[in-house]
Amino acid sequence: MSRIKSIKDINCSGKRVFVRCDFNVPVANGEISDDSRIVAALPTIRHLIAEGAKIILSSHLGRPKGEKKAEYSLAPVARALSGHLNQPVTFLDDCIGESVEAKVAEMKDGDVVLLENVRFYKEETDNDPGFAAQLAKLAEIFVNDAFGTAHRAHASTAGVAKHLSPCVCGFLVENELAYLGDKTSNPERPLTVILGGAKVSDKIKVIDALLEKADTIIIGGAMAYTFALAEGRTIGESLSEPECIPVAKAAIAKAKEKGVKFLLPPDNLAVKDLNFGAGTVGEQTFFEGNIEEGWEGVDIGPKSIELFSEAIKQAKTVLWNGPMGIFEIAACNKGTFAIAKTIAEADVCSIIGGGDSVKAINMSGYADKVTFMSTGGGASLEFLEGKELPGVSVLDTIS
């Protein structure tokens, strides 16, 4: 059985190491409001410092679309990293070129530099071979520790690997592959999967893949309204994808055939006048079964919370991807936060599968009580679907 080579498997003392991180953090006026992605990269960086490597950090921030824009600069990240590492992190105001090469040539063992945003060049997202070669020129070894962009074949996530050797994963990517891979493919059973969010079309391939592995699948969020239509229920003005009714019906049938429990919300919180921008909902009520005309479903109801919580408590492994309702609005967050609380308090291996679920569990205050939180959004979903991730497939394997 082969596995991806990790930084633990190589000697990088005195070597220049190009580390692709995911420092795509929220920045406003030079201030970082959530540094969890920076913190997630620290174990890999600290290991390389201790090994005496010369560490060249690379990342994107936002979508500058190939233009140099000050608001997308990684300078604030360099400052934050210096604080966390208790040592200087030199910020370079470009990511390729002679001045960058000259600065890198002056590095001593244990030094850390951060390159400017790779997406200031459109060649990054084009996976341009010439641009990848210029990035690779800076180093000898490639470490990918950016799981959040592993599903993208970009110059700094995949292209550089053609020019550097060895190519290995950092601790963050290693953990992601272990939890989203091994622990969902060979889980301690029963495995309960909770899927929420807005669109069935985004998650249908994941549902299909997980029907092969799960003992119970719970559906919440706006996705559940499309499944309600598939079961012949009315959903009022709730968000749905009528074109996905056939695939929803097929998923329900496949679950029955496989003996997988497939739980949909028996009741919902519905509102009359949802205004997301203002964070208001107007009149609200609970509907069991059908939602009446003029009402919009925004969260799961108390009976759903009870049903879903029971399934979570009976599990040994829980994978959660996607909120139960519009958790950003206080009136509609009870379902999501109740599920977060149940997962936190249950005796389970809990895996939070990226994106909005991580945001929701952070807001709920239970983040420190879960086993593992994925840093990937789209990457987590594609990996759970069984797709090959370009940023992982370029790495060396070891048997």
Identify what each model region corresponds to.
Residues 1-399:
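Active-site loop-to-helix "anion-binding N-cap" substructures in soluble metabolic enzymes
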